Amino acid sequence: GDGIYKSIDAGNSWKNVGLKTSEHIAKIIIDPENTDNIYVAAQGPLWRSGGQRGLYNSNDGGKSWNRILHVSDDTGISDVVMDQNDNDILYASTYQRRRHFGILVAGGPEGGIYKSVDRGQTWKKLKAGLPGGDIGRIGLAISPQKSNVVYALITAKEETKGFYRSGDY
């Protein structure tokens, strides 16, 4: 891919609004309280380091973008979720991946789950109750009834991969 596209006429026409070197966009969420506030999970290029990897935020409807979470030039963001009961709270999952001739590195020690309580200004890596070591792709969800219940579907080693639930984040 070549970035984020936006339509203001119900999909009749589209305009590229940035993140052209992200190549792989995993998710886009729009703040329900302010539709100009957009979060984009960018995985980055598969075949090389760099590109626009990380979690990006636009406060002006896509006119400008700021990277608000970045781990490394080989690790992108595979998911981002916003607490529907408190839009200040975000969770994001990181995914370290690279394709080389004949192999795909689909996970590594930089994979994990991060939490922000200030709309992405600061982040804390969550570790309690989660697997360590090489982590692959992670899918996230927050319970709409109980915001402190967070679900994660984690690809990892055979003994640690699986469906995780926390009731205290």
Tell what function each PLM region has:
Residues G1-Y169:
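Beta-propeller blade termini and top-face loops
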